[in-house]
């Protein structure tokens, strides 16, 4: 899924004209800042059927508070969005090295809502600060890394390597995004999941968005991985629609980690001979995407 994140800098952006599967909106900062365009953008995104996230910027300049103070301020101002949007801590302010502060904020929001927020920062901070406490808390990671940061449209790059976090939920890969319908730069993001996965992060119960738990494994529509063994070994991933050959061991680790994080169990795994694979392809009219 491709999406954008916006703040008051994009006030008035018409989301009906900008292509995006999701939009993440700055809601609050510190103990006193409220984005004046947040609710307008939120309501438009909701009416358009977009997936939504809302974030709090920690230690907004001049409005710094304790984790509990800022958490309470955030929740007070987004109470109408709970259950409709992913809740997020943007951690890149003056206290960006204070992992205990971040963990306390995330824990506070989780305790008050029963929903685990995402944690946002950038790779240079993540990989030079010990955020293992946040990772062990099972908070989803939204990570930023821009590289050369040249003007570009959507792409779906692999996530950067991150210390402690086995799974990247969302990757912000440029702040120089250019999309139709908006005359200016936008932050562009890729979410490594589908709409059902997004809804799980929002906090919707799994029985609201997926079939009953007693459904048996269906190799025609359910996610699974399989290994072909004959001479050399090849690993493939089926995402419910398309079969992909994996070219990098880190891809397999990412898929397994994401599936376990969302579903609370290991992704189904099969071992096939090439002959069995050919039968499957012919029976269900599947065409693999080879590396």
Question: What is each stretch, according to the model?
Answer:
Residues 124-136:
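Beta-rich nucleic-acid/ligand-interaction surfaces
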Residues 114-127:
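Aromatic-lined carbohydrate-recognition surfaces of secreted/lumenal glycan-active proteins
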Residues 1-115, 138:
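Substrate-binding cleft of extracellular glycoside hydrolase catalytic domains
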Residues 94, 124-127, 146-151, 175-178, ...:
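Short Gly/Pro-enriched loop/turn and capping motifs at secondary-structure junctions
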Residues 15-19, 77-81, 135, 162, ...:
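Alpha-helix C-terminal capping segments
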Residues 1-10, 15-16, 134-213:
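Functionally critical loop-and-helix segments that line ligand-binding/catalytic clefts
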Residues 210-291:
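Short, surface-exposed polybasic-aromatic patches that bind anionic ligands, especially phosphate groups
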Residues 3, 22-24, 53-55, 88, ...:
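Ordered hydrophobic segments in well-structured contexts
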């Amino acid at each position: 899924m491709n999406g954008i994140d916006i703040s008051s800098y994009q006030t008035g952006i018409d989301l009906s004209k900008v292509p995006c599967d999701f939009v993440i909106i700055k809601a609050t900062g510190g103990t006193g800042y409220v984005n004046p365009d947040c609710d307008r953008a939120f309501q438009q995104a909701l009416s358009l059927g977009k997936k939504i996230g809302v974030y709090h910027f920690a230690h907004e300049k001049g409005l710094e508070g304790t984790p509990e103070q800022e958490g309470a301020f955030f929740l007070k101002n987004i109470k109408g969005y709970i259950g409709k949007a992913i809740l997020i801590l943007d951690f890149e302010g003056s206290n960006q090295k204070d992992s205990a502060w971040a963990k306390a904020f995330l824990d506070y929001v989780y305790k008050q809502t029963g929903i685990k927020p995402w944690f946002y920062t950038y790779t240079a901070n993540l990989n030079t600060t010990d955020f293992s406490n946040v990772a062990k808390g099972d908070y989803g990671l939204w990570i930023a890394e821009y590289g050369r940061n040249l003007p570009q449209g959507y792409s779906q790059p692999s996530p950067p390597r991150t210390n402690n976090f086995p799974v990247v939920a969302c990757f912000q890969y440029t702040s120089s995004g250019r999309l139709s319908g908006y005359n200016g730069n936008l932050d562009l993001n890729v979410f490594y999941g589908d709409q059902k996965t997004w809804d799980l992060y929002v906090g919707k119960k799994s029985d609201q968005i997926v079939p009953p738990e007693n459904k048996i494994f269906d190799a025609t529509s359910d996610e699974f991985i399989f290994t072909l063994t004959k001479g050399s070994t090849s690993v493939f991933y089926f995402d419910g629609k398309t079969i992909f050959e994996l070219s990098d061991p880190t891809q397999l680790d990412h898929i397994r980690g994401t599936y376990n994080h969302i579903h609370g169990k290991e992704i189904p795994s099969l071992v096939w001979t090439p002959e069995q694979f050919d039968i499957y392809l012919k029976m269900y009219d599947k065409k693999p995407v080879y590396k």
